[in-house]
Amino acid sequence: MSEFVTVARPYAKAAFDFAVEHQSLDRWQDMLAFAADVTRNEQISELLAGAVAPETLSRTFIAVCGEQLDEHGQNFIRVMAENGRLLVLPAVLQQFIELRALLESTVEVEVLSASALNDKQLANIAAAMEKRLSRKVKLNCKIDKSVLAGVIIRAGDMVIDGSVRGRLERLTDVLQS
């Protein structure tokens, strides 16, 4: 997967720069998301992995995407097909989203909790994370019963484990050492 990220980076950067220049970030993100979903289709991924001529591949892929791709999006798909890189479209999308977050000075923060959090709790978490990261945050809340109670917060490579499960694991480690 890390090789996909490396391969995807220049494509994501090119798409991102074009989208910024033409003030079409939303449109490009939507096109990339749709194209990435198409690559996840079992029949399409088999076609992409097979020995198919790039022209045929790009024509087929663009036909499947239909009107979801504008002219520039179709050209982008053609270039990726010519270079045999359509399978990395999900990684291109992820890189594009990360570049957009940097531009907009936001960071996506994942919040795992055992049950749904109320608006006040979410506001407190958002405020604390914005202060700590010095950036705007976008909370992505998920419910995970294995947390037991408390929350686990992830932002990039930073993890704050305030869960009962985490405390029990740390206590177990201390008792076993």
UniProtKB/Swiss-Prot annotation:
Domain of life: Bacteria
KW Ion transport (keyword) present: yes
Record keywords: ATP synthesis, Cell inner membrane, Cell membrane, CF(1), Hydrogen ion transport, Ion transport, Membrane, Transport
InterPro entries named among the record's database cross-references: ATP_synth_OSCP/delta_N_sf (IPR026015), ATPase_OSCP/d_CS (IPR020781), ATPase_OSCP/dsu (IPR000711)
A cellular component term, taken from the record's GO annotations: plasma membrane
GO molecular function: proton-transporting ATP synthase activity, rotational mechanism
PROSITE patterns, sorted: ATPASE_DELTA (PS00389)
Membrane-spanning residues: none
Primary location group: membrane
Protein topology in the membrane: Peripheral membrane protein
Subcellular location field: Cell inner membrane
Function: F(1)F(0) ATP synthase produces ATP from ADP in the presence of a proton or sodium gradient. F-type ATPases consist of two structural domains, F(1) containing the extramembraneous catalytic core and F(0) containing the membrane proton channel, linked together by a central stalk and a peripheral stalk. During catalysis, ATP synthesis in the catalytic domain of F(1) is coupled via a rotary mechanism of the central stalk subunits to proton translocation.
Family of the protein in this entry: Belongs to the ATPase delta chain family.
Complex and partners: F-type ATPases have 2 components, F(1) - the catalytic core - and F(0) - the membrane proton channel. F(1) has five subunits: alpha(3), beta(3), gamma(1), delta(1), epsilon(1). F(0) has three main subunits: a(1), b(2) and c(10-14). The alpha and beta chains form an alternating ring which encloses part of the gamma chain. F(1) is attached to F(0) by a central stalk formed by the gamma and epsilon chains, while a peripheral stalk is formed by the delta and b chains.
Name of the molecule in the record: ATP synthase subunit delta
Annotated source species: Serratia proteamaculans (strain 568)
